[in-house]
From Swiss-Prot:
It comes from the Bacteria. Keywords: Repeat, Signal. Transmembrane segments: none annotated. Sel1-like repeats lie at residues 48-66, 85-101, 143-173, 180-215. The gene is yjcO. It holds the Pfam family Sel1. This is Sel1-repeat-containing protein YjcO. The lineage of its organism: Bacteria, Pseudomonadati, Pseudomonadota, Gammaproteobacteria, Enterobacterales. InterPro entries: Mitotic_Regulator, Sel1-like, TPR-like_helical_dom_sf. Residues 1-17 form the signal peptide.
Length: 229
């Protein structure tokens, strides 16, 4: 699961008695001090919703100089509702981005458009995302394009542009799953994000409907639920 998606779906646990623990394939190497294994293990725990274990392994990897792990630490600090720390997250994300982490660029951009981190800087955020979105071999390109689409769909800090939003969502979906980006945008407008996205039922319906039209079943389900609710 992408990092930006986890902001909406954090703390969702999947209890499967017969399944291995998240990232178990990385555990041996992580315990032996392999910083990339530590990062991948942290990322696995983050995606599964265990922020405590994610932070433990991300910190180990970051201490060894892994820039992506530093970006993940920043993401954790803007995800955990118990200990939100946007200023510290910004410091970590800047460090990660300066070290060349595309994940760091996306996370920093997300922080820069949220008022909880101070005065928003949309031009810098958009520049970071445009840069990250060009590396299609990197998973962060999916998140970068989704966030660009959301910024244009939201129309705060910059002029709203649904055509640009649609273009970025489709580009993101083309390298992930068709209709998912529009679904994600719809759910963001449905639930809101403090400091960035205000709840907006009409925008939620618009993007969920487009997701459904793209063939994303969950988008259809949420659109129907919201329409009839």
């Amino acid at each position: 699961m992408k990092k930006i998606i986890a902001l909406m779906l954090f703390l969702t646990f999947f209890a499967h008695a017969n399944d291995s623990e998240p990232g178990s394939q990385y555990l041996k190497a992580a315990e032996a001090g392999d910083r990339r294994a530590q990062y991948f293990l942290a990322d696995s725990w983050f995606s599964s919703g265990d922020l405590s274990k994610a932070e433990y392994w991300a910190q180990k990897a970051a201490d060894s100089g892994d820039a992506d792990a530093c970006a993940l630490l920043a993401q954790i600090k803007i995800t955990n509702p118990v200990s939100l720390d946007y200023p510290q997250a910004k410091v970590l994300a800047e460090k990660a981005a300066q070290a060349g982490s595309k994940e760091g660029e996306v996370t920093l951009a997300h922080i820069l458009v949220n008022t909880q981190a101070g005065k928003p800087d949309y031009p810098k955020a958009i520049s970071l995302l445009e840069n990250a979105s060009e590396d299609l071999e990197n998973d962060s390109a999916v998140d970068a394009q989704m966030l660009l689409g959301l910024i244009y769909a939201n129309g705060v800090g910059i002029k709203a542009d649904d055509d640009k939003a649609t273009w970025y969502f489709k580009r993101s979906s083309a390298i992930s799953r068709t209709g998912y980006s529009e679904y994600w945008a719809g759910m963001m407008f449905l639930n809101g994000e403090e400091g960035f996205i205000e709840k907006n039922k009409q925008k939620a319906l618009h993007w969920l409907n487009l997701s459904c039209m793209e063939g994303f079943d969950t988008g259809c389900e949420e659109f129907e639920k919201l329409t009839n609710g």
